[in-house]
């Protein structure tokens, strides 16, 4: 069996690194994609049944501005896609953790797994190696996002009819965008500080901090603070008003 160093010497291209990383990561990617798909498909009917029978909701569930902190208004919950937007806001947390943890794992592997496999960089250099890792991250994000969006779409068709396709695309599309943003942050952090032995803990703390910043900025109404968190870029109730993302956050 050829090891990575011999493959690099023979071919010396980005795709070699990508194929190698893909073989090592595909099980991790497929588990994430399948888990997200099963969870969203199972939770959509449960939450829709709760809205249809409001007496089952906790008495103070709608008080205290809770829904506003996740970008959903109470009135919007009565719309066909309102509850999906509520669920999507929390699944975005999982997407952010996946993206950042996967990126950190790719770029800190030499430290966390005590391996020197990427010290043999003469055939193609670090730039090609990094390109291969980033390509693996992009493919992994596409697969998990496709599984999540497809399961969401099927569940919405089965359990909730009459929804707007444009609004659904905007809501569901925020999941891969959040995943990519946190994945990019993981790439930058992994390149800057590769000696990270706790990539999962780092990713979880970063995503949770981003969520707290967004919730805090919405609570006090501070737009300046909202720029510090990727979750602020995708406010669900605005999709139903302007029918697009707020481009100012991407400038």
Task: Describe each model-derived feature in a short phrase.
Residues 11-36:
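Aromatic- and glycine-rich beta-strand/loop motifs that create alpha-glucan
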Residues 82-109, 204:
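Long, hydrophobic alpha-helical segments
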Residues 106-138:
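Helix-loop-helix units of permease transmembrane domains in multi-pass membrane transporters
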Residues 1-14:
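Short, Lys/Arg-enriched N-terminal segments with co-localized hydrophobic residues
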Residues 17, 25, 42-80, 192, ...:
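Terminal transmembrane helical anchor/hairpin motif
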Residues 99-103, 151, 184-185, 230:
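Hydrophobic/aromatic residues in alpha-helical transmembrane segments
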Residues 37, 41-45, 49, 81-87, ...:
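Secretory targeting signals
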């Amino acid at each position: 069996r050829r090891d990575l160093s011999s493959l690099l010497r023979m071919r010396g291209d980005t795709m070699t690194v990508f194929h190698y990383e893909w073989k090592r990561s595909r099980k991790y990617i497929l588990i994430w994609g399948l888990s997200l798909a099963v969870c969203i498909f199972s939770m959509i009917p449960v939450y829709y049944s709760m809205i249809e029978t409001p007496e089952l909701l906790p008495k103070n569930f709608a008080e205290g501005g809770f829904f506003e902190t996740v970008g959903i208004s109470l009135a919007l919950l009565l719309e066909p896609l309102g509850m999906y937007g509520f669920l999507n806001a929390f699944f975005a947390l999982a997407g952010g953790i996946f993206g950042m943890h996967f990126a950190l794992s790719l770029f800190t592997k030499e430290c966390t797994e005590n391996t020197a496999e990427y010290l043999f960089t003469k055939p193609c250099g670090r730039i090609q190696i990094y390109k291969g890792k980033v390509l693996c991250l992009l493919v992994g994000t596409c697969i998990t996002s496709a599984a999540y969006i497809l399961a969401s779409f099927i569940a919405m068709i089965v359990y909730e009819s009459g929804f707007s396709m444009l609004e659904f695309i905007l809501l569901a599309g925020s999941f891969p965008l959040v995943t990519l943003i946190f994945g990019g942050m993981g790439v930058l952090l992994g390149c800057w500080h590769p000696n990270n032995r706790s990539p999962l803990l780092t990713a979880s703390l970063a995503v949770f901090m981003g969520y707290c910043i967004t919730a805090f900025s919405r609570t006090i109404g501070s737009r300046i603070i909202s720029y510090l968190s990727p979750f602020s870029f995708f406010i669900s109730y605005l999709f139903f008003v302007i029918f697009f993302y707020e481009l100012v956050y991407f400038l």
